[in-house]
Amino acid sequence: MSTVPLTLSEILELAKKTLLANGCDEENASILADTIMRAERDGSVSHGLFRLPAYVAGLKSKKINGKARPELENVAPSIIKVLGNNAVAPMVLSLGLPAVIDLAKKNGVAVLAIKNSHHMAALWPETEAIAEAGLVGIACTSYKPAVAPAGATKPLYGTNPISFAWPRPGKTPVVYDMATASMAMGEVQIAKREGHKVPLGTGLTKEGKETTDPGEIADGGVILPFGGYKGSSIAMMVELLAGALIGENFSFETAAKDNNDGGPPSGGEFIIAISPEKISGKGWDKHADEFFTKMSAMDGVRLPGERRHKNRLNKGPRNINEELVNKIKSLS
């Protein structure tokens, strides 16, 4: 695989230039480009420049409104709803996150329901932001069906990621962000592009047979849930929280309404912010740190998010797939 080194500034500039050339206004382009750059910076490459061609396809097909302004509504004392108006998720979150953080600090807990937005990307940026504000953050989202329920061979669920973040005053938060599938679809697609095999148990071919070929999974096959029935049940929970509970589509409904003319279809996200101080009182952070200290002292264990923060400290260039860079340059 040929790669080219790009600095973080070059990644940001390339993403923003491409978005501006394809229908985004300055604010939308700046916010989304920053999200893409941060994903590359932190090693979340399946949510970095890899996603840019799909965003452009969505802009060209008019699924994504590159000039959208989301609308916020306070629907109850601890519930906020944001209508995305076909904006990309980072634009919606720039409005919704500060509001849900303020509300959780005031009331102890707050819910943010996001509707009619496009591609929630990685979830850790929002839960990490919540944790950096001293709150516990939980988020989940669904997408087009790509995952079979346990025992099935056809897709019904999205990869349905969930993210959790725990605040650590004076330290980096503990954050995890994971698909409820055995592997995120973006990782399957990258493995296909780079000619890598995936572990047995990742997915099935379109004939319902196990395979280690990511191409057979991505092209008409299906991903399996992690942990069999356990992961399948968690994926079902995400469908309900990010679908029925907030008045958004289930994954299969999203697929039925998608005309496949390019780019990600719209969907929703469910976010909770909780104040540990309001619930536990003083000393909650020291108590939690005792647990993290115990955990870190065990051989072979690292806290969730440590690798991402280590990547973040590296200010040097990132090696980006050359074919991808050339493709992006052709879009602008």
Describe each region flagged by the PLM.
Residues 2, 6, 11, 21, ...:
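Catalytic-core signal marking the mid-to-C-terminal active-site face
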Residues 4-8, 24-50, 64-75, 263-266, ...:
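N-terminal glycine-rich anion-binding loops that anchor highly charged ligand groups
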Residues 48-101:
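Active-site cofactor/substrate anionic-group-binding motifs, chiefly glycine-
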Residues 73-79, 95-110, 203-220:
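Residues forming anionic-ligand binding surfaces in small-molecule and nucleic-acid pockets
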Residues 79-169:
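A generic, well-ordered mixed alpha/beta core segment in the N-terminal half of proteins
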Residues 147-215:
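Phosphate/diphosphate-binding glycine-rich loops and adjacent basic-rich segments that engage nucleotide
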Residues 193-252, 257:
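Secondary-shell segments that build the walls of catalytic and ion/ligand-binding clefts
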